[in-house]
Structures are given as C-alpha cells and as structure tokens.
Amino acid sequence: MALPEFPQGFTPEYLTKSLGGTFLPEGTSVSKVSRSPLGEGTGMMADIAKLELSFEGNSEGLPHSVIAKYASENPTNRQVAMLYNLYERETRFSEELDPLTEARCPEFYFTGLENDNFVILMEDMTDYEVGNQSVGATLAQTELAIDELAKLHASFWEKVDHLEWVPGIADSYHADNMN
C-alpha cells in the first residue's frame, strides 16, 4: 500500500486499510478521524499527532485513539532525518526489535516506509505521566526509567552489532556524516 503524504493522508479509508488485520476486527472500518498535533514545535525529525477514531462495525474493546508518528513537514528536518536513516531505524525497531525486548514500548499497529516518507501508528499512551525536563523526575520516576532502560539494553547488548541499520558509537555512517 502506497503511503500518502501526511498529515492530510490520515483519512478514514487510509486508516481502515492500514489498521485492518492487526487492529481492526474483520468487517470494522474507520468512519471518522480527527487529528490533534502533539508536542507541536518539540519534534525534531518527525511529527506526532493523536488520531481520534470513530468506527463502523464492531468496535468493542478498541481504543478510540492512536498515535501517529510521521515524516516531518519541515523539508530541512526531513532531509536530516534521511541523511541519518532515522525513518528506517524507527520503523525497523518497531517491526524487528520491539518484539524482542521486555521494555515497555507502545503497541505498534502499523508501520510504513517509502523513500522519504514514513508512518508509525501506535498505542495512545498520552494518559501516562510525562516527565518535566525543567523540574526533573521524582525518585520513583527515575527508578522506573532506569528499570526500563536496563531491560532495553539487556535485550540487545552485543546482539545487534551485525545489524547495519543500528548505529554504533565509532566507525558508523553517523560519524562520516558529521563532517
């Protein structure tokens, strides 16, 4: 399925096709979608929006919102993201590595990557508390973050060196692009 340009591509028809088979029960379709940007002005290489969904058919147990992460509308940011393969890395993490870790990540419903365009449709976790960069985290928040980071790193320590798309610290394509 070809990726439309986002955010205007988030139509009920597109979302029904992309969420069918993984998120939507058979015979259920997205009938209406409304989009609210999240973190406006804070995203660097991608844009993020909350998509509020209405359904036609059996929607029992379905969340009525998903988070969409998609290629930046800013051409400079998009160019930098492509230079560092950020869209490929994001989609491949969700498809290939997320299933291998016990770290708490959102559930991924759909990923798509085409040239300089990408989209990830994932679980809406906006009800979770987000830390404050100015104030800092509480002890409990810090402990939780360290526990989750430990799970993430333990899952992949010395296990992804053969994956060309996972950046290393030295001698990587990222070092070459820093000139």
Where are these regions (language model features)?
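Conserved ATP-binding subdomain of kinase catalytic cores across diverse folds
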Residues: 36-179
